[in-house]
Amino acid sequence: MKPVLSLLFKLGKKKQTLEKAVESIQKGNKDLQNELIQQYKPFIAKTVSSVCKRYIDEKDDEFSIGLIAFNEAIEKYSPEKGNSLLAFAELIIKRKVIDYIRKEARSAQNINIDLQEGDDQESSQSLIEAELSIDEYRRQIEQEQRREEILYFQKQLKDYGLSFKELLENSPKHTDARQNAIKVAMTLVEHEELAAILYTKKQLPVKQLEQLVSVSRKTIERNRKYIIAMCIIITGDYIYLKDYLKGVLHS
């Protein structure tokens, strides 16, 4: 009997087939889930390696983190929100590995402090230098995580015919206008039927949305690109971009 996955890959294009496989897994097909993870181990290792900047063996802790993250991506993936499973999985894997590295760095710093306590002035100076080095490393890790979020966000924007440059050029200039646009986006995602229109047709349901919000149709249409982008962020697996939303709403 041929493996379930090899049969699935005969159904059509790879992306469509992968989505079918994920749909089956999310309905409880554990055998297929194990096969899919096994097949994509090279992808997982490559993604983890891009973060760690070294060769990754399956015995490495970082690979195990990547494996868990890939499995999480399979369970959380929703094709209606745009972009491919692999793009989504790449974001989740990199984020989880970066979090792991950050925790390991913090643990190493605590050990360093314990070892250096009670030592002379020279040792204290070494400790300060070590702490500064770890802080710089953390900043680099955070910058990498922000960059990965932006790259994934750009891929999602592309599904809606938008670019990051267009978004910057078409963002509302005033804080209150940005706040209103974000509230419109929040209203949209709260209504499943409107969110479904956005996800499937890649268009803003302006007519239906107009009846639910306190801003005019003209305002909705003028801020269409920004509202779509905010919907992507609200419903997406973003950390730093959601902080941006909170910052706008509370400014």
UniProtKB/Swiss-Prot annotation:
Superkingdom as given in the UniProt entry: Bacteria
Entry's Gene Ontology molecular function annotations: DNA binding; sigma factor activity
One annotated GO biological process: regulation of DNA-templated transcription
Pfam families, per database record: Sigma70_r2 (PF04542)
Compartments reported by the entry: Cytoplasm
A cellular-component GO term for this protein: cytoplasm
Coiled coil: none
Inducers of expression: Part of the sigI-rsgI operon, which is transiently induced by heat stress. Expression is positively autoregulated via the sigma-I promoter. In exponentially growing cells, expression is regulated by the WalRK two-component system, which represses the sigma-I promoter and activates the sigma-A promoter, leading to the formation of a basal level of SigI. WalRK can also positively and directly regulate transcription of the operon under heat stress through a binding site located upstream of the sigma-I promoter. Repressed by glucose.
Motif Polymerase core binding: chain residues: 61-74
Effect of loss of the gene: Cells lacking this gene exhibit normal cell morphology and growth rate at 37 degrees Celsius, but cannot grow at high temperature.
Regulation: Negatively regulated by the anti-sigma-I factor RsgI. Upon exposure to heat, SigI is released from RsgI and activated. Transient heat activation of SigI may depend upon DnaK chaperone.
DNA-binding residues (ranges): 206-225
Assembly notes: Interacts with RsgI.
Function field: Sigma factors are initiation factors that promote the attachment of RNA polymerase to specific initiation sites and are then released. This sigma factor is involved in regulation of cell wall metabolism in response to heat stress. Acts by regulating the expression of genes such as bcrC, mreBH and lytE. Also plays a role in survival at low temperatures.
Alphabetical list of NCBIfam families matching this protein: PRK08311.1-3, sigma70-ECF, spore_sigI
Family, similarity comment: Belongs to the sigma-70 factor family. SigI subfamily.
Protein name: RNA polymerase sigma factor SigI
Phylogenetic placement of the source organism: Bacteria, Bacillati, Bacillota, Bacilli, Bacillales
